[in-house]
């Protein structure tokens, strides 16, 4: 048995069914022989994104795996891996390396060294008979505590080394979580009960812990409104009366106003990272309760009054029991009053945006595309993701995600084009869902040729390209350069590219045809075809920013 065969047997025991990859790597042939489906991407960063999206939707119960060749293959994967690292996504990365006899030669790229700052752990297999121990450590670290990408480098001579089958003594690893200190929870629970205007901030830790039901129960016990971070979007049902919406660089008005008036802010499953894109800023003067599974989050950017360490589901259950012991059941009148306060803010805010959401202008306003999409697609049946820049800023405040993992939020590391790989991975994880990524023409230019991967590999996603032939999100930063050299101008017919790559594609220029085009595209995906809709849109650059 060769080392690569042993690795593939371990992958099978861990439930891995496909291997996102790009040659050359001996693992690809070994995986196919072992019955693991190789999915060949067109560019390594997208291949990582496929594994990333898969891991997010499965909450790490099945870990996405990506393998690539040494040198340029590993180098091309960098932005995909940094996205997974910044968003704490459990991934297993298996790059080939040079043979041990030459791996230390100057100028040879070493994945384990280069990726150390943007992975949870890196390790090289130095002895073939240690493959089980190395892979056991790798799978343990992907999901234990704060999840993250783990990289195992495989020297070329080790990859094909013969080992004894007795060396393959591998049992799938078990995940474990821990609760919080009971005294810490009791003290924080009393603070929450005494608060006049508490607000809950939920992060993606709630999603990975599969704790949305507990979060709803806690919110109703406290009559506390809930906002999520961008990565945490869908952790709390956004159609719930206590939902404020997603708090990020753009947000609905209720998020901004309720945070401003809060006396206590309870962060659960979030890192409280001060980041202009993914999280609403916490105003000064608040009492902060912070529950996280990573001690590095505590006091990172905000001074924490009540730090709590533990798994989000376990911690929420502890809070619920503590509150019931003190208070009993929830108060419907208080819940109703808070919900009414949210409506009083949300309705006029939404009314201000209705001219754009219902616009009949040509080129089509991108907000009209989003509005029509929300009308004709049941969000419970879909998984949606944005891309960087305008599509994210336009989609996030208005699209309501009602169920866990019905939206993939990302952007701590916000490389253009990331959404395409993520949505392919989501479709592989949840083939019954209508999986859609919204991207701009700039993002399509970065990764759009991997639409062919979706076509070739029978991954029937819908890619919506909002094409304004312009880099609109950077307008305020590029005035002089654009006036003199047209630096924001772009061009291209992306529906023609989609058809040329073998997919179903259509270009839409009439706002009255938006809804019917979306329905046609959905039917194409239901018939097993990857679909691309190109909407010719205006250079809309107004976003629902608060506090500017």
Regions from the PLM with identified roles:
Residues 219, 259, 366, 388, ...:
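Active-site-proximal structural scaffolding
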Residues 153-157, 389-391, 536-538:
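A glycine-rich phosphate-binding loop feature that marks nucleotide/adenosyl-phosphate handling sites
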Residues 4, 12-14, 18-34, 344-421, ...:
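Active-site diphosphate/adenylate-binding microenvironment
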């Amino acid at each position: 048995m060769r080392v690569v065969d042993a690795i593939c047997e371990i992958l099978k025991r861990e439930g891995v069914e496909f291997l996102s990859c790009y040659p050359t790597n001996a693992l690809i042939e070994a995986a196919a022989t072992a019955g693991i489906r190789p999915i060949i991407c067109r560019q390594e960063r997208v291949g990582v994104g496929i594994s990333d999206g898969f891991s997010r939707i499965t909450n790490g119960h099945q870990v996405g795996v990506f393998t690539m060749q040494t040198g340029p293959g590993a180098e091309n994967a960098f932005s995909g891996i940094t996205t997974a690292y910044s968003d704490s996504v459990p991934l297993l990365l298996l790059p080939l390396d040079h043979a041990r006899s030459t791996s230390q030669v100057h100028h040879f790229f070493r994945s384990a060294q280069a990726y150390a700052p943007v992975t949870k752990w890196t390790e090289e297999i130095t002895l073939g008979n240690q493959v089980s121990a190395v892979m056991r450590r790798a799978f343990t670290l992907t999901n234990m505590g704060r999840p993250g990408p783990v990289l195992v480098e495989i020297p070329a001579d080790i990859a094909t080394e013969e080992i004894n089958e007795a060396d393959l003594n591998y049992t799938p690893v078990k995940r474990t979580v821990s609760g919080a200190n009971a005294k810490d929870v009791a003290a924080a629970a009393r603070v929450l009960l005494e608060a006049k205007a508490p607000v809950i901030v939920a992060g993606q830790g709630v999603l990975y812990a599969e704790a949305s039901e507990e979060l709803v129960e806690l919110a109703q016990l406290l009559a506390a409104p809930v906002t999520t971070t961008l990565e945490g979007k869908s952790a709390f049902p956004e159609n719930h009366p206590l939902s404020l919406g997603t708090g990020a660089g753009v947000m609905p008005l209720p998020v901004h106003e309720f945070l401003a008036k809060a006396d206590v802010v309870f962060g659960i499953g979030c890192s409280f990272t001060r980041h202009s894109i993914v999280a609403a800023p916490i105003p000064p003067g608040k009492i902060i309760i912070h529950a996280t599974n990573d001690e590095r989050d505590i006091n990172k950017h905000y001074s924490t009054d009540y730090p709590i360490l533990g798994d989000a589901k376990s911690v929420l259950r502890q809070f619920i029991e503590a509150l019931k012991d003190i208070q009993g059941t929830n108060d419907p009148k208080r819940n109703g009053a808070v919900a009414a306060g949210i409506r009083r803010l949300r309705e006029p805010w939404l009314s201000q945006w209705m001219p754009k959401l219902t616009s009949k202008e040509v080129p089509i306003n991108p907000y009209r595309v989003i509005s029509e999409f929300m009308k004709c697609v049941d969000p419970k049946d879909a998984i949606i993701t944005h891309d960087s820049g305008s599509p994210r800023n336009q989609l996030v405040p208005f699209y309501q995600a009602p169920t866990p993992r019905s939206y993939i939020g990302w952007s701590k590391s916000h490389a253009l084009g990331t959404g395409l790989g993520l949505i392919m991975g989501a479709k592989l994880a949840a083939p019954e869902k209508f999986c859609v990524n919204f991207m701009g023409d700039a993002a399509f230019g970065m990764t759009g040729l991997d639409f062919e991967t979706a076509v070739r590999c029978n991954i029937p996603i819908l890619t919506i390209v909002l094409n304004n032939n312009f880099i609109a999100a950077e307008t305020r930063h590029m005035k002089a350069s654009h006036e003199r050299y047209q630096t924001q101008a772009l061009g291209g017919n992306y529906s023609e590219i989609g058809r040329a790559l073998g997919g179903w594609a259509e270009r839409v220029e009439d706002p009255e045809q938006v809804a019917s085009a979306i329905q046609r595209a959905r039917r194409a995906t239901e018939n097993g075809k990857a679909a691309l809709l190109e909407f010719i849109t205006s250079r809309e650059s107004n976003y629902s920013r608060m506090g500017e």
